[in-house]
């Protein structure tokens, strides 16, 4: 080790060797999300910003629609500091509204479309939203959610609103939308026609967006993200030292809904600030992914493992040329090292210019905090971010290669949990004028500066063997089970066993159900071979699919309830 190195990742920052001096020291953007997006494209006004079902929307048109939306919102009484609740998919109106709300100095509260009406009701009240705008698909839930709430105006927008004319007619004929009692989009826009909007000075410290946590291990919380945090993500994607190869005018396929933090900050804001043409796909289903990717031939795309799995399935029986692909970025549950390797092989065998690009982040870090490169699936923090690893018992900082809780700092950290100061204080602290966030994830930083995630603290179980208490790590068990060729997906939870701690319960999605008896025996043998006795599952349950949260993540709470109900 270099004599000037301390061994502590937060001091040595070994990942900085992968970045240029410009990436490390360039000033971060000031102002609002709207300000930064506009500044990045001020010389590209006639270039396409958005692509929706083949209809291209230039930056000039985008600016016009943002201003029209801002006037319409002003007609509804929206002003600086107000919160506008949006329940939308990846459609042009979501982009217009994001930046219009931001330009007014207000806050965009993105509601999860498949949340329950009660959850939506609570989120609207917590944000004190007087204006709610929903896509027509969610009208039923929103109509129920706004009852006895603070919402005074509720507007509905159709998925077909910005489609090309013929496509829109065919869509409406097929969809047969029910009559609405909500204010239509056209009426909303008409009301702002002669209104003068007031655009206040907007700072990087001002709140810009509220997004909601995934709720995999607890109730979803609203996360307040500032302008500066949002802009730092887009800016740092520009400064990856060529690890990600963006060129002006290339296409970015946006298939993730804006109610995911990743969908807003990486799916909308980052492509626009990097001068890419954003292809908006309102149907986020994995089944739709292969068709739209090959139709638009987008050089850059992002999604979850299920999206790429569908592409792999699609390509089994067809000739698929992916030579146009330059960035295939994925995050979320189910990304084992074996999966990363096999999907990278798939991409390269179909002539893609990259393998899998993986990221690490959370809603509290504006979606992403680390990224890998096109050459490796190992993740490095962005240049302006920092990481320390702390012992989960003593909270003492650990050295490189030592496993503990991952704690992060940097410009993309959230401001607060909405209306939850106690929970905010539990995960954030200040040290030497630097704000730090506890991620709840286990891992370590390698001597080469790579971040390795090994587990989730909230999911750690304990078990007794003799008189000794042992920690049990579900992710380690999942890794072993997932290594079996017959396993498509798995999740491990604990079942309370009194003073003995927890029994390990494994839920497994096999590739073929008819092979399950043999697979179950082989999994038991594999776990006995690879894991300590306290980590052996006492039961293996086959499933057609694992339950998921509204955010699309594995719902471990649902699995824990299932395990608890077993006799």
Question: What positions do the PLM features span?
Answer:
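AMP-binding/adenylate-forming catalytic domain of the ANL superfamily
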Residues: 157, 531-554
């Amino acid at each position: 080790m270099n004599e000037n190195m301390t061994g502590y990742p937060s001091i040595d920052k070994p990942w900085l060797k992968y970045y240029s001096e410009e990436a490390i020291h360039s000033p971060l953007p000031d102002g609002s999300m709207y300000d930064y997006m506009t500044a990045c494209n001020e010389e590209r006004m006639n270039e396409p910003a958005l692509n929706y079902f083949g209809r291209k929307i230039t930056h000039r048109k985008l600016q016009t629609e943002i201003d029209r939306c801002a006037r319409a919102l002003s007609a509804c009484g929206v002003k600086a500091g107000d919160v506008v609740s949006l329940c939308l998919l990846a459609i042009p109106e979501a982009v217009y509204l994001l930046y219009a709300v931001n330009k007014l100095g207000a806050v965009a509260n993105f509601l999860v479309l498949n949340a329950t009406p009660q959850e939506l009701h609570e989120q609207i009240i917590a944000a004190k939203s007087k204006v709610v705008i929903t896509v027509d698909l969610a009208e039923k839930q929103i109509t129920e959610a706004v009852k006895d709430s603070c919402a005074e105006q509720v507007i509905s927008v159709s998925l077909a609103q910005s489609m090309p004319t013929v496509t829109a007619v065919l869509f409406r004929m097929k969809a047969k939308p029910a009559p609405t009692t909500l204010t239509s989009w056209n009426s909303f826009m008409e009301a702002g026609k002669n209104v003068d909007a007031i655009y206040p000075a907007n700072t990087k410290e001002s709140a810009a967006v509220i997004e909601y946590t995934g709720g995999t291990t607890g109730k979803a919380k609203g996360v307040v993200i500032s302008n500066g945090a949002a802009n730092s993500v887009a800016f740092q994607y520009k400064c990856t030292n060529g690890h990600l190869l963006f060129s002006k005018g290339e296409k970015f396929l946006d298939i993730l809904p804006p109610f995911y933090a990743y969908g807003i900050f990486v799916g909308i804001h980052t492509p626009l600030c990097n001068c890419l043409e954003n292809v908006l796909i309102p149907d986020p289903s994995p089944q739709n992914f292969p068709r739209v990717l090959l139709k638009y031939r987008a050089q850059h795309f992002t999604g979850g493992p299920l999206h790429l799995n569908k592409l792999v399935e699609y390509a089994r029986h067809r000739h698929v040329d992916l030579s146009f692909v330059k960035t295939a970025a994925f995050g979320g549950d189910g990304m084992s090292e074996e999966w990363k390797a096999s999907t990278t092989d798939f991409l390269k065998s179909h002539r893609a210019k990259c393998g899998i690009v993986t990221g690490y982040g959370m809603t509290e870090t504006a979606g992403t905090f680390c990224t890998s490169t096109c050459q490796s699936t190992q993740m490095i923090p962005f240049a302006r971010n920092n990481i320390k690893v702390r012992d989960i018992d003593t909270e003492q900082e650990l050295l490189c290669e030592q496993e503990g809780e991952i704690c992060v700092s940097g410009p993309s950290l959230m401001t607060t949990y909405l209306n939850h100061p106690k929970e905010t204080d539990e995960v954030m602290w200040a040290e030497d004028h630097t704000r730090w966030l506890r991620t709840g994830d286990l891992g370590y930083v390698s001597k080469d500066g790579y971040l390795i995630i090994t587990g989730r603290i909230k999911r750690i179980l304990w078990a007794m063997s003799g008189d000794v208490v042992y920690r049990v790590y579900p992710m380690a068990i999942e890794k072993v089970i997932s290594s079996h060729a017959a396993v498509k997906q798995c999740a491990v939870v604990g079942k309370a066993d009194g003073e003995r701690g927890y029994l390990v319960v494994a839920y497994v999605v096999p590739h073929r159900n008819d092979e399950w008896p043999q697979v179950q025996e082989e999994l038991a043998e594999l776990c006995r071979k690879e894991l300590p006795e306290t980590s052996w599952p006492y039961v293996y349950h086959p499933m057609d699919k694992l339950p998921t949260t509204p955010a699309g993540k594995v719902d471990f709470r649902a699995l824990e309830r299932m395990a608890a109900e077993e006799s």
